[in-house]
């Protein structure tokens, strides 16, 4: 079982698509895209993704990618 990273399509238009594509190439991560993740406040203020249900944010696409991997490393139990 892999960690699951979920993206909102609106947030992908802000640079999240770069992160999505990078993670999609990683066989150790499952990546999903949704029309909306119901986190409009976070989504409107910057880049974010849900990592196993937890909100992870970043100031730039590279920062978000780094924060996602850090979150997985710190919280993943499998």
Curated annotation (Swiss-Prot):
<dbReference type="InterPro" id="IPR009910">
    <property type="entry name" value="DUF1450"/>
</dbReference>
<comment type="similarity">
    <text>Belongs to the UPF0349 family.</text>
</comment>
<protein>
    <recommendedName>
        <fullName>UPF0349 protein Sca_0544</fullName>
    </recommendedName>
</protein>
<dbReference type="InterPro" id="IPR022916">
    <property type="entry name" value="UPF0349"/>
</dbReference>
<dbReference type="Pfam" id="PF07293">
    <property type="entry name" value="DUF1450"/>
</dbReference>
